Amino acid sequence: MEYSFPRYLLSKQSVDDRALNRTVLDSLKANLPATPIRIIEVGAGIGTMLTRLLRWELVTKADYILVDEMTENIQTAREWIPLWAVEAGLGVERIEQDLLRVFDQARDVRIRFECAEVFDFIQKKPAPADLLIAHAFLDLLPKPESMPRLLALTKSLAWLTINFDGVTSLEPTIDAALDEQIERLYHATMDTRPTRLSKNHVFRQNASPMVGQSPDYSL
């Protein structure tokens, strides 16, 4: 079977559901401003975080900008989110190719699809959001150089979830030598991971773990 990154993102929804820090999620919910709110998600993939927030009723009335640099992801999001919404009992209105509305009596969310590198998107100087989301994405960026530009996308709140912290554990131990080799090779790919971000924007590439002082960081 040919590898499909959108299929991978779709298949791991339940894994991410369980991995998200619910204490941080409760804190986020308590600090969100009154609706409607403006949300920007970078590295948004096919939109599984958006549908998760709708399922969990964290987002009820919002403008949601879904940003990803992979054309395949954005195309899948355009097609999959309406199908998901119908199955969830939500109404769907296609306003434009890249503007979708999903709604019912309790929820009304307008979704804009942006196929762009995150720093190209930032250079457009979009209006800051009430909430910035980056899910399993920060470890793709050079840090700390990229953080001021990324955080300029939000007025105050940032929910930056499931980030590689430089540590890998394989359990249970079956072959310690093999585990060590797998860990070493995996960490090498994280240290040298090529992205289009580094080609078009000048940053010093490193693999330092993200250290956050805000309660909005989810580990």
Predicted segments, located by residue:
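Conserved S-adenosyl-L-methionine
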Residues: G43
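Conserved catalytic/acceptor-binding region of the Class I
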Residues: S156-L219
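A conserved beta-strand element that flanks and buttresses the S-adenosyl-L-methionine
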Residues: I133
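Glycine-rich SAM-binding Motif I of class I
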Residues: G47-T51
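A short, conserved alpha-helix within the catalytic core of class I
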Residues: L140-T154, I162
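Class I SAM-dependent methyltransferase Rossmann-like catalytic core
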Residues: M1-A34, I46
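Short conserved loop adjoining the S-adenosyl-L-methionine
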Residues: D120-P126
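Class I SAM-dependent methyltransferase SAM/SAH-binding core
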Residues: L53-D120
